[in-house]
Swiss-Prot record:
Residues 89-242 are annotated as: Thioredoxin fold. Residues 34-201 form the Phosducin domain. Its main location: endoplasmic reticulum. This is Phosducin-like protein 2. GO terms for biological process: acrosome assembly; protein folding; spermatid development. CDD domains: Phd_like_VIAF.
């Protein structure tokens, strides 16, 4: 097959009639390198430095550079503070009942707080704590805490455990009370992540409810059982009429 980029009279005719696309121009590597170097030259050296490096190199810049450096340093400092604020949690912390108001209800403004009321003798509570520990590391901008149920609510019934409350600005935005609402005894990490994301407490990268696949299989199984059951019943009725 003839190369469409080949320099032939026939190819030129085909290009003139629009049958062949225009010939690809070879990239000029030297031109690309020059453009890249020009772009790099426009970047001030201090824009590549860390805050510590800027401090060490202060004597090497003139007054004009120093003004720009101060602006740049302040920008970097604010970015660093914002990052530290966003990542100030990162673990599932144990609190007591008398800390509930300060740690949960009166938590920092606009901070999502997830609290798990548990009892260590209940297996699902231990599983939920394991999952929440992993989610706390994955979503450090959200506050995750746990507390023994009776230390927060006296005589709290075991049938209500595990209990997960989701707070923001002192208001309960979501709650999961008991085994069923929390996801069942075989609760998967992704399922709990999805539940908390639906409330808004975390920003998940899951694209769909992981529980949906299980539900779809169950529905399909029930539907098939119903179809086969109707078929067997029909066959039985047919045989009876004979």
């Amino acid at each position: 097959m003839q190369d469409p980029n080949e320099d032939t009279e026939w190819n030129e005719i085909l290009r003139d009639f629009g049958i062949l696309p225009p010939k690809e121009e070879p990239k000029d590597e030297i031109e690309e390198m020059v453009l890249r170097l020009q772009k790099e030259a426009m970047v001030k050296p201090y824009e590549k430095m860390t805050l510590a490096e800027l401090k060490e190199a202060e004597d090497e810049f003139d007054d004009e550079d120093m003004k720009a450096i101060e602006i740049y340093r302040e920008k970097r400092l604010q970015e660093w503070k914002a990052l530290k604020k966003k990542q100030k949690f990162g673990e599932l912390r144990e609190i007591s009942g008398n800390q509930y108001v300060n740690e949960v209800t009166n938590a920092e403004k606009d901070v999502w707080v997830i609290i798990h009321l548990y009892r260590s003798s209940i297996p699902l509570c231990l599983l939920v704590n394991q999952h929440l520990s992993l989610l706390a590391r994955k979503f450090p901008e959200t506050k995750f805490v746990k507390a023994i149920a009776n230390s927060c609510i006296e005589h709290y019934h075991d049938n209500c455990l595990p209990t997960i409350f989701v707070y923001k600005n002192g208001q309960i935005e979501g709650k999961f009370i008991g085994i069923i609402e929390c996801g069942g005894i075989n609760l998967k990490l992704e399922e709990l992540e999805w539940k908390l994301a639906e409330v808004g407490a975390i920003q998940t990268d899951l694209e769909e409810n992981p529980k949906k696949a299980i539900v779809d299989v169950m529905v399909s199984s029930i539907r098939n059982t119903s179809i086969y059951g109707d078929s067997d019943s029909s066959n039985s009725d047919s045989e009876d009429t004979k």
